[in-house]
């Protein structure tokens, strides 16, 4: 018999030693060589099985460390079983709480193998690549006979209890209750599905609200419409951009366009008004005080003196006998006296009664009377030959 047979002897059963030796052991201990060989073979298989059971126990202890809620659920298994017995007495015909507790505290080799297969299947399903839209809250149902659907709460202690074929009917009923509670709320999954679709199709960056207004050319007709609207509102000082925009009623015109144009229009109007007021200040500055009228009097005096010189020059040319200095002095003296006699009463009357405009009109009338009467008097005197 070889040391490592190709096919192990499955007829061997490992069990604690019995007080009564069996007949099989007596037959195999017939010879000493056969006894030594059997002891060596049994020692090899015992070591192999011990290593396998130790690995399974280490896996189970690591799972209990990673999932601390399992101990709590196992310790409270009698409470769950009592509730199931109270509500569903037909589910537990032949089960006691002590049997369920011992079956979970000391799992058999078949349960451990099934648990390993379940964990491997769970890891393979979770490590699959996700294609399309990932719906984390609504995974597709896996029709596995021993795997319950994942509950809504990820840290539920009852979800950590493995449901095997040899588990108690109480736990299967508990898992079915969780399944119905998770399926009975379809609005929750629909809501998450809609939010994920909305987040997918929404743009990443929202559109800017404060976009700059496009440039616009102010034509003559548009400006005329603007000026008309400003005049209807009572001038550029009272008009507001919003009211002007409403009165103009132009399609592509914005409030920014009207605001900037109204500001420019106000600056132009104020500068024009300042220039006009500075140009007219020389004429209308002292109109009420009479200084402007005095300038007009000086201008009229110069004009009258020029007229008198024109009158005397043709007389001197026509009459050579009267070209002496005494005649010129008398002629100039008479003209000045006549002008003074006319001017003095007119000034007194105008200062007491008339305004500046009436003074100007009276001055024109007095100048016309002087120019009309003065040439006849010297002509009459010279024609008559009167000498003083």
Curated annotation (Swiss-Prot):
InterPro entries noted in UniProt: Homeodomain-like_sf (IPR009057), KAN_fam (IPR044847), Myb_dom_plants (IPR006447), SANT/Myb (IPR001005)
The biased composition feature labelled Polar residues covers 10-25, 277-292
Superkingdom: Eukaryota
Might you name a Gene Ontology BP term for this protein?
regulation of DNA-templated transcription
Q: Which residues bind DNA?
A: 241-266
Organs and tissues of expression: Expressed in developing phloem.
Q: Where in the cell is it found?
A: Nucleus
SUPFAM superfamilies registered for this protein in UniProt: Homeodomain-like
Q: Domain HTH myb-type, which positions?
A: 210-270
Any idea what job this protein has?
Probable transcription factor that regulates lateral organ polarity. Promotes abaxial cell fate during lateral organd formation. Functions with KAN1 in the specification of polarity of the ovule outer integument.
- Provide the protein name: Probable transcription factor KAN2
Report the gene name: KAN2
């Amino acid at each position: 018999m070889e040391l490592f047979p190709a096919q192990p002897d499955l007829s061997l059963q490992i069990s604690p030693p019995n007080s009564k030796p069996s007949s099989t052991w007596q037959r195999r201990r017939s010879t000493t060589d056969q006894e030594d060989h059997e002891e060596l073979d049994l020692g090899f298989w015992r070591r192999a099985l011990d290593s396998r059971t130790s690995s399974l126990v280490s896996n189970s202890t690591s799972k209990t460390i990673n999932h601390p809620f399992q101990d709590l659920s196992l310790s409270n298994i009698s409470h769950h079983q009592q509730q199931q017995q109270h509500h569903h007495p037909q589910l537990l015909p032949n089960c006691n709480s002590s049997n369920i507790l011992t079956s979970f505290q000391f799992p058999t080799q078949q349960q451990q193998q099934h648990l390993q297969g379940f964990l491997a299947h769970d890891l393979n399903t979770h490590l699959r690549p996700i294609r399309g839209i990932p719906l984390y809250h609504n995974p597709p149902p896996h029709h596995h006979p021993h795997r319950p659907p994942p509950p809504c709460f990820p840290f539920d202690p009852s979800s950590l209890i493995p449901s095997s074929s040899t588990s108690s009917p109480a736990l299967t009923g508990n898992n079915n209750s969780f399944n119905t509670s998770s399926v009975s709320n379809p609005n929750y999954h629909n809501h998450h599905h809609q939010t994920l679709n909305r987040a997918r199709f929404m743009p990443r960056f929202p559109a800017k609200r404060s976009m700059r207004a496009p440039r616009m050319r102010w034509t003559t007709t548009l400006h005329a419409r603007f000026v008309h609207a400003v005049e209807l509102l009572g001038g550029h000082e009272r008009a507001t951009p919003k009211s002007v925009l409403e009165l103009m009623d132009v399609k592509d015109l914005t409030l920014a366009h009207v605001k900037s144009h109204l500001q420019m229009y106000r600056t132009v109007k104020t500068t024009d008004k300042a220039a006009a007021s500075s140009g007219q200040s020389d004429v209308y500055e002292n109109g009420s005080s009479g200084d402007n009228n005095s300038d007009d009097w000086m201008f009229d005096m110069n004009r009258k003196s020029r007229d008198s010189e024109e009158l005397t020059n043709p007389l001197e040319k026509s009459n050579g006998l009267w070209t002496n200095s005494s005649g010129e002095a008398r002629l100039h003296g008479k003209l000045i006296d006549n002008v003074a006699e006319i001017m003095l009463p007119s000034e007194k009357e105008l200062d007491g009664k008339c305004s500046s405009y009436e003074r100007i009109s009276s001055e024109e009338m007095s100048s016309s009377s002087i120019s009309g009467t003065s040439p006849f008097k010297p002509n009459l005197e010279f024609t008559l030959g009167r000498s003083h």
